[in-house]
Regions:
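Non-catalytic beta/alpha edge segments that cap or flank active sites
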Residues: 2-162
Length: 162
């Protein structure tokens, strides 16, 4: 879990979103360390890239997905993705809107796959994170299983020339 927040990284306040994501991942059966809190911008990309290199199953980030000039998380994360999963980010935005939060439409959150790692960027508000957790609860375990070769027999087999 990567938390993108200039203020939390500087100690102005304690982040409350990262622990929500860690708790959800642990509830879903993932061994998850405490959140990494970094300033907005390039440190977010570096933290996500480190997690991808470590070959973790899932990276969830919170913060930096809006339209504030310092919100750069999607710009840092998107180049790291091998494949985009636009439906995941769209589902999170749609859920927020359906819950009566029209500003959820302003989120630039992205989701995708880097190697065998699922990456999803979430808003920095506790409400946005809770919405994300609701949407991701069934998706994350299934996606991780698929990325590990499950659900499709033979998907781990090397390609053979035809």
């Amino acid at each position: 879990v990567v938390v993108a927040s200039n203020r939390a990284a500087c100690g102005v306040y304690e982040d409350r979103t990262g622990p929500l994501l860690v708790a959800a991942l642990r509830e879903w059966g993932f061994e998850t360390p405490d959140p990494v809190v970094v300033p907005d911008g390039p440190p977010v990309g570096a933290a996500v890239a480190d997690a991808i290199r470590a070959e973790v199953s899932v990276v969830l980030s919170t913060g930096g997905t809006g339209i504030n000039p310092t919100d750069r998380t999607p710009d840092e994360v998107e180049p790291l993705l091998d494949r985009s999963l636009p439906g995941v980010a769209e589902a999170i935005r749609a859920y927020g809107i359906a819950q009566g939060v029209p500003t959820a439409a302003l989120s630039r959150g992205v989701a995708g796959v880097a190697g065998r790692t699922l990456v999803v960027t979430l808003p920095g508000s506790t409400g946005g994170v809770r919405d994300g957790i609701t949407v991701l609860a069934d998706l994350v375990p299934h996606a991780v299983d698929q990325l590990a070769g499950g659900d499709h027999p033979g998907s781990m087999a090397p390609e053979t020339p035809s």
